[in-house]
């Protein structure tokens, strides 16, 4: 066991984490040169294309150190994005050490810091590594100062390397072997294994990636999940060297996979503890929590007959993504669809993209909403994730909205515009620190404001230099109202939004005027109204198309003309009673885009 090292790599997006992983695999001979391709561990096309890591992956490698000893290195690749922070904390808790990769030309960024703090809280040893030192813009001294300043770990002897050219990667491995402690654990104790990740394979069912903390596991053992209590016989166990390789046993300190013929992913929850049925552990490993979706949106097929196909696609995605929630919902305007829950905005985009790309779906997405806590007059509290479920204003005692703590990092030139943005979004400033040229701002902002377009606007006002991460803090009472859109007195449910009262008038006017442009003129007048409860806050009229009924009258008596006009008016009135206004699909899409502005 003294020769096992479990480590993961922490880095901000694009700081070269996956490339470094590739080099390490190559040096340790995990794959032949022929099988080597860039970003070996990012197995999803979308991961490669966006250059982000979504699922955790592992590789068990052997490394012959300079002192002649052979070490078993278990590398656990972690996602870097804030939406997947729970997966990160699980990956990190399976390690004893973490390589903190910092781009020598860019310095420390927000998500690096967020994940690094998670690592330090879990008691993982952090080893700083400066990557991309082959770039002409690299400034290692500056980066070292930032690491010490912002994160507060000693970085004077940080290893310098360039993952692209392979320079200095062996020094990184030497530092790993020297500084990361070997795993603690007792191979004889009752089995405790932490599920780091799980995914669905078409041939063998659910594959669980585990770190054995105590005990030993062999094929044919019966295992039990401690969170759900489900039991399964083990079929295969082994390790990934990125390719899978079956073994006869996995014992304390090792990281490997278990295949046990599990049919659905919900049974193998990330962070759960696996133990043996006939010799169970006394208690599960700490830190398990159910992941709750934070952002909700409605997904509707453009063609109504694709509803079943959409349901199948969501089921298939759910096999590989336990944090995706969905339930069917019906909208009068958009027909049948699903209300889906996501961890955050990136997660939502990825799910949408995978549906469109891997399953060929055409989707309409309603504006994302967050979960509000509503205290009703009768004393009950309900959680509202869909504007349509919001009770009438007369029944509401108070509404509480989720508040998130946002950490922002940016060069000091952009501080002014970022502060303005945060204030527009009803943020309150908590803290502001200068670290050399970088500034760290901490704000508390309502989550509903963050999910709409905060990230895009932050990037555009800071020319892409600002980075952010956020975490949920608490529910807080707020003056939020539901704005409904009426067309000729009928509610259009898909366009209801929940906004802060201060923005409700502007929002109502904006949507009403947009609808006026987009709804084609009818044979009768159409009134578009925005309402809060029974109060109308904005109105637009679309005038009727009308025939010139006086054309055949040439001169003649005024009473004759009046009679014809009255007759036309009565006809229009009758039409208005029976007619219903069809809203074209383009109008919906355009209105949902207004909300992104």
From Swiss-Prot:
<dbReference type="GO" id="GO:0097216">
    <property type="term" value="F:guanosine tetraphosphate binding"/>
</dbReference>
<dbReference type="Pfam" id="PF03144">
    <property type="entry name" value="GTP_EFTU_D2"/>
</dbReference>
<dbReference type="InterPro" id="IPR000640">
    <property type="entry name" value="EFG_V-like"/>
</dbReference>
<dbReference type="InterPro" id="IPR009000">
    <property type="entry name" value="Transl_B-barrel_sf"/>
</dbReference>
<dbReference type="GO" id="GO:0005525">
    <property type="term" value="F:GTP binding"/>
</dbReference>
<dbReference type="Pfam" id="PF00679">
    <property type="entry name" value="EFG_C"/>
</dbReference>
<feature type="binding site">
    <location>
        <begin position="131"/>
        <end position="134"/>
    </location>
    <ligand>
        <name>GTP</name>
    </ligand>
</feature>
<keyword id="KW-0997">Cell inner membrane</keyword>
<dbReference type="InterPro" id="IPR027417">
    <property type="entry name" value="P-loop_NTPase"/>
</dbReference>
<dbReference type="InterPro" id="IPR035654">
    <property type="entry name" value="LepA_IV"/>
</dbReference>
<dbReference type="InterPro" id="IPR038363">
    <property type="entry name" value="LepA_C_sf"/>
</dbReference>
<keyword id="KW-0547">Nucleotide-binding</keyword>
<keyword id="KW-0648">Protein biosynthesis</keyword>
<keyword id="KW-0342">GTP-binding</keyword>
<keyword id="KW-0472">Membrane</keyword>
<dbReference type="InterPro" id="IPR031157">
    <property type="entry name" value="G_TR_CS"/>
</dbReference>
<dbReference type="GO" id="GO:0003924">
    <property type="term" value="F:GTPase activity"/>
</dbReference>
<feature type="binding site">
    <location>
        <begin position="14"/>
        <end position="19"/>
    </location>
    <ligand>
        <name>GTP</name>
    </ligand>
</feature>
<dbReference type="InterPro" id="IPR006297">
    <property type="entry name" value="EF-4"/>
</dbReference>
<dbReference type="InterPro" id="IPR013842">
    <property type="entry name" value="LepA_CTD"/>
</dbReference>
<dbReference type="InterPro" id="IPR035647">
    <property type="entry name" value="EFG_III/V"/>
</dbReference>
<feature type="domain" description="tr-type G">
    <location>
        <begin position="2"/>
        <end position="184"/>
    </location>
</feature>
<keyword id="KW-1003">Cell membrane</keyword>
<dbReference type="Pfam" id="PF00009">
    <property type="entry name" value="GTP_EFTU"/>
</dbReference>
<dbReference type="InterPro" id="IPR004161">
    <property type="entry name" value="EFTu-like_2"/>
</dbReference>
<dbReference type="InterPro" id="IPR000795">
    <property type="entry name" value="T_Tr_GTP-bd_dom"/>
</dbReference>
<dbReference type="GO" id="GO:0005886">
    <property type="term" value="C:plasma membrane"/>
</dbReference>
<dbReference type="Pfam" id="PF06421">
    <property type="entry name" value="LepA_C"/>
</dbReference>
<keyword id="KW-0378">Hydrolase</keyword>
<dbReference type="GO" id="GO:0045727">
    <property type="term" value="P:positive regulation of translation"/>
</dbReference>
<dbReference type="GO" id="GO:0043022">
    <property type="term" value="F:ribosome binding"/>
</dbReference>
<comment type="similarity">
    <text>Belongs to the TRAFAC class translation factor GTPase superfamily. Classic translation factor GTPase family. LepA subfamily.</text>
</comment>
<protein>
    <recommendedName>
        <fullName>Elongation factor 4</fullName>
        <ecNumber>3.6.5.n1</ecNumber>
    </recommendedName>
</protein>
<comment type="function">
    <text>Required for accurate and efficient protein synthesis under certain stress conditions. May act as a fidelity factor of the translation reaction, by catalyzing a one-codon backward translocation of tRNAs on improperly translocated ribosomes. Back-translocation proceeds from a post-translocation (POST) complex to a pre-translocation (PRE) complex, thus giving elongation factor G a second chance to translocate the tRNAs correctly. Binds to ribosomes in a GTP-dependent manner.</text>
</comment>
<dbReference type="GO" id="GO:0003746">
    <property type="term" value="F:translation elongation factor activity"/>
</dbReference>
<dbReference type="InterPro" id="IPR005225">
    <property type="entry name" value="Small_GTP-bd"/>
</dbReference>
